[in-house]
Swiss-Prot record:
This is Arrestin-C. One of its GO terms (cellular component) is photoreceptor inner segment. Keywords: Cell projection, Disulfide bond, Sensory transduction, Vision. One of its GO terms (biological process) is signal transduction. It comes from Ictidomys tridecemlineatus.
Length: 393
């Protein structure tokens, strides 16, 4: 049985325009970004000699939509790329068609038109700040949207009903040649102890994938007269909002205490496994997530990989992680643990998706996943329509 290729379809409210995309996640290779290849199907009676455009917009949203009615704008367009699809402009010729575009054009007929949008490399990736329970409307963050409409020119005002919009994501994946794992050390001296306490921590590799257990190796050389009662390991997410302010948010996405007693004048080495997950932080307001598509699960935001020389302000939101290893050192005496000292180190953590395997487009079947608007709330709902071969074209 031949495998089938999934295609995402979105139709305008007036039913006259449809966008077809082979995927909604587009890979950022740091130096280049995958092009957005698709097809637009238009009713010829609706087109009526007008022009048809496809526009890609990257926007940074940092406020609620309902505040726009009082004259406050909380959305900034970071990048807009426009392509005139009908009639095609001679100064922007269409490159070679992809296999999927050829299949769609054959299936949809003469009223279907291909388009290719090649965004620049210095744009942010899709990031969403997790809203609180009382928040409504679109979440704050960076999003990408593909929009198509028919008009006499770009200045003509087009209603939402007469246009079709589909949200896509720009995502980064793990580098092909990651560097060595991070390592950190601290030495602490205590009063009345001749020798110091030495703490070392390291990870076996630089890059870790979402949902993958992270091995944190801890080595302690306790040459003091103190007793170590606990080892605490935590993972912090640091979010820098650099576009309109210098806000920085640090949220602990994993924390666990390990009861390990390390006596005076002794050594200790052990590997601990930690796994930061969104499922354990699903109600944390302001947590950075990978850009969310409706009806699909997401995860903690991936670490931002910055190309050398890139203007960080253009990235809107920068996300990084660190692993903290802390020792609770008992000072003894009458107060015991109440006067315990905290000795710790920090390790940088790169949390990201593995690079997906190359997908090949089937020459046989196309499965179309259509997004239709609900009558009451205008939200998208999703239904899968299997259209095999050329049936129904």
């Amino acid at each position: 049985m031949a495998s089938s290729s999934k295609v995402f379809k979105k139709t305008s409210s007036n039913g006259k325009l449809s966008i077809y995309l082979g995927k909604r996640d587009f890979m950022d290779h740091v130096d280049t970004v995958e092009p957005i290849d698709g097809v637009v199907l238009v009713d010829p009676e609706y087109l009526k000699g007008r022009k048809m455009f496809v526009i890609l917009t990257c926007a940074f949203r940092y406020g609620r939509d309902d505040l726009d009615v009082i004259g406050l704008t909380f959305r900034k367009d970071l990048y807009v790329l426009t392509q005139q699809v009908v009639p095609a402009e001679s100064n922007s010729p269409q490159g070679p068609l992809t296999v999927l575009q050829e299949r769609l054009l054959h299936k949809l007929g003469e009223n279907a038109y291909p388009f290719t949008l090649q965004m620049v490399a210095n744009l942010p990736c899709s990031v969403t700040l997790q809203p609180g329970p009382e928040d409504s409307g679109k979440a704050c963050g960076v999003d990408f949207e593909v929009k198509s409409f028919c008009a006499e020119n770009l200045e003509e005002k087009v209603s939402k009903r007469d246009s079709v919009r589909l949200v896509v994501r720009k995502v980064q994946f793990a580098p092909m040649e990651p560097g060595p794992g991070p390592w950190a050390q601290t030495i602490r001296r205590f009063l009345l102890s001749v020798q110091p306490l030495q703490l070392q921590a390291w990870m076996d590799k630089e890059v870790h994938y979402h949902g993958e257990p992270i091995s944190v190796n801890v080595s302690i050389n306790n040459s003091t007269s103190k007793v170590i009662k606990k080892i605490k390991i935590s993972v912090d997410q640091i979010t820098d909002v650099v576009l309109y302010s210098l806000d920085k948010y640090t949220k602990t996405v994993f924390i666990q205490e390990f009861t390990e007693t390390i006596a005076a004048n002794s050594s200790f080495t052990q590997s601990f496994s930690v796994t930061p997950l969104l499922s354990a932080n699903c109600r944390r307001q302001g947590l950075a997530l990978d850009g969310k598509l409706k009806h699909e699960d997401t995860n903690l935001a991936s670490s931002t990989i910055v190309r050398p020389g890139m203007n960080k302000e253009l990235l809107g939101i920068l996300v990084s992680y660190k692993v903290r290893v802390n020792l609770m050192v008992s000072c003894g005496g009458i107060l015991g643990d109440l006067t315990a000292s905290d000795v710790g180190v920090e390790l940088p953590l790169t949390l990201i998706h593995p690079k997906p395997s190359q997908e090949t487009t089937s020459s046989e079947d196309i499965v179309i996943e259509e997004f239709a608007r609900q009558e009451d709330g205008g939200e998208e709902k999703q239904k899968a329509l299997a259209e095999e071969g050329d049936e129904g074209s």
